[in-house]
Amino acid sequence: MRNPKLKNLLAPTLLSLAMFAGATQAAAPLRPPQGYFAPVDKFKTGDKSDGCDAMPAPYTGPLQFRSKYEGSDKARATLNVQSEKAFRDTTKDITTLERGTAKRVMQFMRDGRPEQLECTLNWLTAWAKADALMSKDFNHTGKSMRKWALGSMASSYIRLKFSDSHPLAQHQQEAQLIEAWFSKMADQVVSDWDNLPLEKTNNHSYWAAWSVMATAVATNRRDLFDWAVKEYKVGVNQVDADGFLPNELKRQQRALAYHNYALPPLAMIASFAQINGVDLRQENNGALKRLGDRVLAGVKDPDEFEEKNGKKQDMTDLKEDMKFAWLEPFCTLYTCAPDVIEKKRDMQPFKTFRLGGDLTKVYDPSHEKGNKGS
């Protein structure tokens, strides 16, 4: 530009425009990936629905639960059958709520029966009114249950909130109650898991960040979104040059299983961040891709993990298709190799309550296979 006066006049204007563009993006309402906007498949009527199961009692007690690895050494890799049963028994109402919410939302998005929606909202509203899962009296397993439950519920709820069918339009009072409860619980989850030392930051922190990301979108809270992104960055910066997570390698014979378990929350956070204008794919030189590739290679040849930590790997968990639900968001973030796509197709649909239900319907709807796995 040859005219210096004009250049000086324009400079502040261009700066203002750039600042305005940034502010507009920051102020734009948070949203989930496009698949969450899907309308209800069809609206059925009549008496073919399953009815509403008995509501699990809202859990308002102390979040003090026994760990299924009780008595194990530092590796936390040996299952204690007795304490696992005690854990399952004492947390039964919570997991019933999680599973029931995901199941009913999936059914409603398929069948559109009003009673399916009402059942879900009644459960969530009752737990919200009781201020459930908010106890400040908790141990590590207790605060873990809180963030798992929040992630399950908030990610299922998002499918209702953002659906183009607007199922919550006639249920604004319940929606406000539920969202206020999610919001308060997310604040507690942040408090529970914030700023842990790196040696104690592992898959639990990633799952906590996922629950906060899902809540951020459900309640349009940018502060929660930013915290989830911060925790994501801490997580993927733990991935080494070969795609290993040092803290998960400590899990001895379960190291590969725990590397795989770390992937769903990280892939979901990256996917949700991406749609809101924050590209996390290249963080730590594409660490998420490196981790995913390492796990897929390990599933083919577990000896890679045995060579790394000296322990023969327990492959039991990795025989369950739904443990690979992370492939749905992962293969939209990165270009997956043909053999990975083929593996994904064989295992679809991916339905997992901790990620809000049917991820294939959200990320790869043309390969959804009806009721399989519901």
UniProtKB/Swiss-Prot annotation:
It catalyses: Eliminative cleavage of alginate to give oligosaccharides with 4-deoxy-alpha-L-erythro-hex-4-enuronosyl groups at their non-reducing ends and beta-D-mannuronate at their reducing end. It comes from the Bacteria. The keyword Signal applies. InterPro entries: Alginate_lyase, Alginate_lyase_dom, Chondroitin_lyas. GO terms for molecular function: poly(beta-D-mannuronate) lyase activity. Residues 1-26 form the signal peptide. Substrate binds at S67, K68, H140, T141, Y258. One of its GO terms (cellular component) is periplasmic space. GO terms for biological process: alginic acid catabolic process. It is found in: Periplasm. Keywords: Lyase, Periplasm, Signal. Its main location: periplasm. Its EC number is 4.2.2.3. Catalyzes the depolymerization of alginate by cleaving the beta-1,4 glycosidic bond between two adjacent sugar residues via a beta-elimination mechanism. May serve to degrade mislocalized alginate that is trapped in the periplasmic space. Belongs to the polysaccharide lyase 5 family. This is Alginate lyase. It comes from Cobetia marina (Deleya marina). The lineage of its organism: Bacteria, Pseudomonadati, Pseudomonadota, Gammaproteobacteria, Oceanospirillales. The gene is algL.
